UniProtKB/Swiss-Prot annotation:
Protein family according to the UniProt entry: Belongs to the GatZ/KbaZ family. KbaZ subfamily.
Subunit structure: Forms a complex with KbaY.
Pfam families: GatZ_KbaZ-like (PF08013)
Protein's UniProt name: D-tagatose-1,6-bisphosphate aldolase subunit KbaZ
Organism expressing this protein natively: Escherichia coli O157:H7
Pathway where it operates: Carbohydrate metabolism; D-tagatose 6-phosphate degradation; D-glyceraldehyde 3-phosphate and glycerone phosphate from D-tagatose 6-phosphate: step 2/2
Function of the protein: Component of the tagatose-1,6-bisphosphate aldolase KbaYZ that is required for full activity and stability of the Y subunit. Could have a chaperone-like function for the proper and stable folding of KbaY. When expressed alone, KbaZ does not show any aldolase activity.
A GO BP entry: D-tagatose 6-phosphate catabolic process
NCBIfam families named among the record's database cross-references: agaZ_gatZ, PRK15458.1
Lineage top rank: taxon: Bacteria
An annotated GO cellular component: plasma membrane
Amino acid sequence: MKHLTEMVRQHKAGKTNGIYAVCSAHPLVLEAAIRYASANQTPLLIEATSNQVDQFGGYTGMTPADFRGFVCQLADSLNFPQDALILGGDHLGPNRWQNLPAAQAMANADDLIKSYVAAGFKKIHLDCSMSCQDDPIPLTDDIVAERAARLAKVAEETCLEHFGEADLEYVIGTEVPVPGGAHETLSELAVTTPDAARATLEAHRHAFEKQGLNAIWPRIIALVVQPGVEFDHTNVIDYQPAKATALSQMVESYETLIFEAHSTDYQTPQSLRQLVIDHFAILKVGPALTFALREALFSLAAIEEELVPAKACSGLRQVLENVMLNRPEYWQSHYHGDGNARRLARGYSYSDRVRYYWPDSQIDDAFAHLVRNLADSPIPLPLISQYLPLQYVKVRSGELQPTPRELIINHIQDILAQYHTACEGQ
């Protein structure tokens, strides 16, 4: 499993290549990603976050072993080779247990790391940047690094115990914004300074040495930094290369290290490519993929309303709205303003809090109903042109079947294609 270290080696040799990480647990998003990687004969990096998946089930109800089983089963069903599949764990540390005293939170984090590594996750992002109940705010670099080194030691021991070799690849550091998009309206964003990046690296190097982990330094392949990209509910802060020049140049002096950029969703294709060229060569994408899924489903729901009597319609959008209103915990603290502003945000926000609701049984039933209604007879081409114009072009040229499922998958793949192109290199 050396896809990532090989990618870094090639990047350092001047290939200007990279890899994107699919950060989603939605079956249609994962199917779209697996099929896209298969068609393009590339490895596929799929990541779970510590919020989604943990030893207690996370918000998806899946443990790391469950998630691996789910992804591998899907890959097998699509004839995707498992040796081309890389599983990563994102923001692994005490993130989920910040309300507990540090000793307790870190004990949970130890078990979190064990569960991810034992399940076969090979890319491990160690993130201990968050303060626990009895911690100072913010934590010093040294405390963050000491905790990360402790987790790295647990990871190495677990990997040796389960697989007979230690072949994990690590990412350290964190971006400044919260994972999953900013809560508030943004206008500008501070880029990580070269000094801050160096301080993080040196603190980690020192902490790893104290744990006797000098030998794993070449397997620390990336540092998470903020290159100046983010999104909120209706705006995107685009990458401005000039503001990140000093940061980009700083990593060139580290032989085995690149940067990892989070919250790259909704960047333009040109910005994605420039990020990779500037050594932000691991691009994380999640909400933009479920946003594309949501776009396709809303389009199909509009087509359904044109074709099917109201009584027989799935009512997907209304079901979704009702469930979100009845269970507001995933959006209430994120979306603000009057009733209309919040209604618009629930449906259309870039932060895509709706992604937390797709597994709901009522919504899933409405989705299945929608697909059934539109699968019974061919969708008229003018309606595909009206509501899914990019897919219409491919349907007309004969490269895409106009079935509900294929239209959804292809719409998601349009986003994946931008990331693939950005990461291809020369």
